[in-house]
């Protein structure tokens, strides 16, 4: 098996990219490539792109679709890395509903020479034991192929298979983390669950780095907020207790599909503890969350995937905002209202944020627009 001794998990902003689909559910390659380039922002956007994740509707596509979007993302990240002189990592989501399809996706990720693979063991319906599957079957495939790539675990209660625990057990994570190729976990959960991971990881005593990425991106504005005033000091002490003074290695931000520069800057100012800029960028990204929130039958309705795709269409990055079957969608009136909200959001961000940190789009010729048209400044 290939040694992973030189691999260190990439810190920073990871974006689980949306999958650009036709109304028939087919991956639109030219538009998918445009979306990847937009998210990278010439090096000012995502540090990592995560293909075929939950935001990418992996659970509503077949394996052909998952592998197609993975191929596109890996290729575009490789091209971008060469162009900007800095590596943009491409992580391939390999999770499928069955063990056989999941392993087929892992084999394909290896063939693509992807930087890493991401698996949600609790989402694989016929995998009775997450650590057994990751150790015996994933490890067995590596041994058979004679090649190894880093594996990152994915813990998200929303996609756990029926009858499975909503979250991975700490003892199972500890066992999997001891495997040479398991290098971290993406935790889509609140602060308490994230804290369980950070506290546990401090006692793993591993021979390699094990990174924890916050899958609820808005948590960083709380976790990294400076201890200013009585309330801030109390929050700071509580956060240190909950996380055992161990902060996330990176952030996985679905809304960075729409605001890649803003989220990159948000991560940086949070890490730096700059209270003024934390508040400013927190407000900027909160505008998108508010724009994605509607009411149906008196209850909040938040179709984030449909909104991210609609926003990319409004910014003229893509032409199709179709979602997969069963993905929550926008009604016509909601779609019109959302377009107006996006326009207001873009104008506010252009007025309030630092120069160079408002996302812009250099239109792709495949979309029949002249190159050099910048979008995102209103």
Model segments located where?
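General structural feature for long, well-ordered alpha-helical segments within catalytic domains
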Residues: 27, 31-35, 65, 69, ...
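A short, hydrophobic/aromatic-rich structural module that often spans a beta strand
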Residues: 95, 112, 196-211, 335-341
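Structured C-terminal cap/extension of enzyme domains
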Residues: 41, 229-378
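Alpha-helical structural signal in soluble globular domains
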Residues: 68, 72-80, 108, 112, ...
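Catalytic alpha/beta core domains of metabolic enzymes, predominantly
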Residues: 144-301
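Active-site beta->alpha loop and helix N-cap motifs at the rims of alpha/beta catalytic domains
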Residues: 2-167, 325-330, 347-378
